[in-house]
Amino acid sequence: WEPVPGTDKYYFHMFAKEQPDLNWENPTLRKKLYDMINWWLEKGLAGFRIDAIINIKKDLDFPNLEPDGADGLAGCWRMVENVEGVGEYLEDLKKNTFEKYDAFTVAEVFNMHKDELSQFIGENGHFSTIFDFSAHALSNGAHGWYDAPDINFNDWRKTIINSQLQVQKC
């Protein structure tokens, strides 16, 4: 959370403070985003890389989370890990922008289950493709990459092959 100068208000940012998280619950904001994307597509841009898109839906109850790190803070990822409805926003984004222009999209989607892959890519997926984080997930310890375990080459290889086989099914 970052204070808004000159006010008693704060804004949330999962990444750099110069990158405030946007309130995708707000239909006016979504329309403005779609207008900006379409502006670029109308100029002839052929596609978009979309980072951290899976984080657009938050638990707006903003619960007090138990600290999970040595610093006494709770990981911000816990605000997005079990939230329902992100797919509705992603489908709305696709229909109002990328689909109209047959634009190529590559999205950063992590912590996804194998059975959800076809929702994200393929004929009816939200995006043209996604970055494959399956091998990266091997480096997650109890606190993410902070306490990452060593990665065994055979596990890495098996993970990559399994991931590619799943993609081919979409």
What are these regions (language model features)?
Residues 1-43, 47, 53-78, 114-116, ...:
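Substrate-binding/active-site clefts of carbohydrate-active enzymes
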Residues 25-32, 81-89, 151-155:
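Soluble or luminal CAZymes and related metallo-dependent hydrolases
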Residues 34-41, 87-94, 164:
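Short, well-ordered alpha-helical packing segments
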Residues 47-52, 104-108:
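A structural signal for short, well-ordered beta-strand segments and their strand-loop junctions
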Residues 63-103:
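Alpha-helix-loop-beta-strand connector modules within alpha/beta enzyme cores
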Residues 90, 94-170:
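Conserved alpha/beta catalytic core and glycan-binding cleft of carbohydrate-active enzymes
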